Amino acid sequence: MTPTDPATAAPAPTAPHPHMAAQVRWRTVEYVFWLATLLPFVVAPDYLALASQIAITALFALSLDLILGYAGIVSLGHAAFFGFGAYAAGLVSKWGWGEPLSGLLIAGLAAGLLGYLMSFVIARFRHLALIMITLGFGLLLLEAANSASGLTGGADGLQGVKMWPVLGLFKFDLYGFTAYWYALIVLFVFFLMARRLINSPFGLSLRGIRENPVRMRAIGAESGPHIRKIYTIAAFMAGVAGAVLTQTTETVSLGVLDFQRSADILVILILGGAGRLYGGLIGAIIYMIARDWFSGVNPQYWYFPIGVLLIAVVLFLPNGMLGGIAQLIDTVRGRRWFGWLTSPPPWLRSGSKP
Amino acid sequence: MASPNSAEPLLSFKNVRAGYGEAIVLDDISFEMPERGSIAVLGRNGVGKSTLLLTLMGFTQLRRGSIIWRGTDITRLAPHRRAQSGIGWVAQEREIFANLTVEENLTVAARPGRWDLDAAFDFFPRLKERRQSKGNQLSGGEQQMLATARALMTNPALLLLDEPLEGLAPIIVEELVRGLRKMITEEGTAVILVEQHAEVALSLTENAVLLERGAIVHHARSADLLKDHATLDRYIGLRVADGKPAQA
């Protein structure tokens, strides 16, 4: 009875919306950021090992950002996937296959599969229940790795990881030269993927689910399948991050599964700004450098300044560093404080209509 | 109900009983509406008007009866499937996505059809002016427009409006009513309108039902009910010309 058939009346839903297309465009500051990631090669060649740690942590934080920042899934056990990937990569190498790239893929798939199984539980809960579940899951996996010492080496760590050169050409060296560019390229590739993902309609749906899952259902998007998808993807990414750590350090310790790691990565993301693509990256840089520096200044109490930093950020920049910067830019441009003087908001104008 | 169209109804409720958990809110609700029809649902607070819409969307527990949508039984269908099949719901609480911009609030709901971003902005020009504003920066009236526009973006065959005029300034009410009238009478969008402003609701719609304690107590053509002061007075306590106090 409808006058037009909805299927033929309008352009296909896959045609990109202009504002989504605009978000995909690269900004100058992004080029600057990625060029700056090459600086350590020149400026601080002694710190390439730290730089590769930062890149790994950034990838891990990015994966947490996908679920926490964009889909609103709280997790206190994200290290489970990082550690699972780390052990998977280590074992593959120990069992005689030391090729790094395929090792990465295998580790990612293993962690992704674990994430996929876990996602069925995750999609059923929110908020506090999620914190408990992810926390418990992380602890379970840690103890499992601890007790399966025949497989994992237990508290002694996994021995005998031997990586072949990347692409058969570049050996992992003592100075972390190969390690850094390897970690950086992996980070960049996954960053591109994440960027594409969150600027897609799927990414927008995730943000809708974060804001209001019931409402999303009422406009036709069931949250369960979306959450399962992003959780699996995030687990894959976390697994790859863990694998890069294994491959660049050629060892795996129980620390990869530790609760401390789950907590740290949460702190890093909040520090940088959750729900922002660069939040985890910036957070990782600041946190890791601060940790390195503070522990050099005072090896015993280096967590103290970290705590101060955290409290300061939460008090003064509730949306993280990037959130604070965005607010600052808004203020400087006068959008927030003075904008309405030069161009009155529409409700003022229509209110004065006769 | 009087319907010019004897073909299959767009929607029919058959002896529906529904509620939340143990509580039964609606009992033995039956009505049907034709394609392009419009129904006003009137009644005092707490008689189950919103629950009727929630039941249609699948957010309550349905104990008995069935809901037929375009010839298909959707009684057990998940809410998102109902939305996909063409039922658009504008909740009383509006439930704007606070941290998405106006444009994102709309595009997140987009589904192919006549209503796209441009059409929605044509319909509510004010939203276009505020397209980059976050949901939580909008005024109440703008939020209501956005909630309505967002439901339209799903290109619904039937729009459920839950007290769209609640708490809005008169000038905004006027603008919104103008929009709704255009939608219902000119464009023939099927609408179920829950509203406290009985006169506005009746002037917008073709038919009306009156709810009392979870049951339909009166069916009428809206135009007739508008003149039937006695009935309105009895069921909604509308203060009409004769000045009788509302019956308890």
Which sequence ranges carry the predicted segments?
Chain B
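The feature captures the beta-strand-to-loop junction immediately N-terminal to the Walker
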Residues: 42-44
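Helix-to-loop junction immediately C-terminal to a conserved catalytic motif
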Residues: 57
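Conserved ABC transporter NBD signature motif
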Residues: 65-73, 85, 115, 119-122
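Conserved ABC ATPase signature
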Residues: 134-138, 142
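ABC ATPase C-loop
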Residues: 151-152
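Helical segment within the ABC ATPase nucleotide-binding domain
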Residues: 174-187
